[in-house]
Regions:
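Nucleotide-activated donor-binding/catalytic signature segment of Leloir-type glycosyltransferases, i.e.
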Residues: 165-187
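Aromatic "clamp/platform" in nucleotide-sugar-dependent glycosyltransferases that forms part
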Residues: 204
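Membrane-proximal helix-turn-helix segments that form the acceptor-binding/catalytic region
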Residues: 51-74
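Short hydrophobic beta-strand element within catalytic cores of glycosyltransferases
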Residues: 221-224
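Conserved donor-binding/catalytic core segment of Leloir-type glycosyltransferases
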Residues: 114-132, 138-141
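Short alpha-helical donor nucleotide-sugar binding micro-motif in glycosyltransferases
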Residues: 183-184, 191-196
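Conserved acidic donor-binding segment of nucleotide-sugar-dependent glycosyltransferases
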Residues: 239-246, 255-261
Length: 300
């Protein structure tokens, strides 16, 4: 007999989880189906050897699909992820609950005593992978620097030495315009947002997209791709653009630089939107409801 009232598993989707489900109430968290990561990795792979390597790396997907379809209770952070989990993993939609992630709006808050650095833009790249769409922002920066020589792009993340992004930055000759910040606390990230004039999320796919909510919580004008879960988070309070378009990023940046006051009004409203809809108190109540429901149905 288990000494646990409930097990919450974060997307291991391993065969052992099915054994756990037999003996204990189980909630499986699936952020998004990793089939999306494989799709974009293959799309941007160069040559057959690289594609084969990606297929081998993602071979665990066979197991995840077999496990996911047998799970009774799944929680995911967006309606878009629910749709994709049902489609790619074959899971019945009735087994999937949508509970958004919460945004720490007390840490990610406007800091009015900090002055914005002229022509500074900020983005987040948690990993050097195609899914994050950083390439398209870099191409936009390369064109914009002709008109804005002092343009600065702050990237929250750590570069992979001699990785794809570093090579592209050198190729575009924008080394002097790029500034990495890594190992920052939430409060330190909020300071970087406060220094910046525009936040960019150029992802090709997001299961939820913390950088979207965190930027909005800091009341900074946001440019974000109109894909996957992102419009669920932003509502009408961001400049939504097509994915995989450096020209759209460039155009949006120019528009905000030309008319910062009107975009700031939208950004201020965006913070209120985040506080009202993505606060942890509200999210916790949704989890509490799902937890009790899962335990009760297991015992029946």
């Amino acid at each position: 007999e288990s000494s646990y009232d409930l097990v919450i598993d974060n997307q291991s989707l391993s065969y052992g989880i099915l054994e756990v489900q037999k003996n204990v109430p189980l909630i499986e968290i699936i952020h998004h189906p990793i089939t999306k990561d494989l799709y974009y990795d293959l799309q941007f792979s160069k040559g057959i050897i690289q594609k084969i390597s990606k297929w081998r790396w993602f071979s665990f997907l066979k197991m995840q699909k077999k496990v996911a379809i047998q799970l009774k209770v799944i929680s995911t952070p967006s309606d878009n992820s629910k749709k994709d989990i049902a489609k790619d993993f074959g899971v019945a939609k009735k087994n999937i609950s949508v509970i958004h992630n919460g945004i720490d709006y007390l840490s990610f808050t406007p800091l009015e005593d900090i002055q914005r650095v002229p022509n500074q833009i900020i983005t987040t790249a948690s990993a050097d992978v195609p899914l994050k769409g950083l390439d398209f922002t870099l191409y936009a920066i390369a064109r914009l620097k002709e008109d804005y020589p002092e343009l600065r792009l702050v990237i929250i993340g750590e570069p992979r030495p001699e990785g794809h992004t570093e090579r592209l930055i050198k190729k575009l000759q924008i080394e002097k315009n790029i500034f990495y910040r890594s190992s920052l606390t939430r409060d330190e990230i909020a300071v970087e947002y406060a220094k910046s004039n525009i936040a960019i999320v150029s992802s090709l796919y997001e299961g939820f997209g913390f950088p979207v909510g965190e930027a909005m919580s800091c009341a900074i004008p946001l440019i974000a791709t109109n894909v996957a879960s992102i419009p669920e988070i932003t509502g009408p309070f961001a400049e939504l653009i097509p994915a995989e378009s450096s020209k759209a990023i460039e155009s949006a940046i120019r528009n905000i630089f030309a008319n910062p006051e009107s975009y700031q009004v939208k950004a201020d409203a965006g913070r209120i939107h985040i506080i009202e809809n993505f606060n942890w108190q509200k999210i916790a109540l949704s989890y509490e409801e799902l937890i009790y429901k899962t335990i009760e149905e297991f015992e029946c």
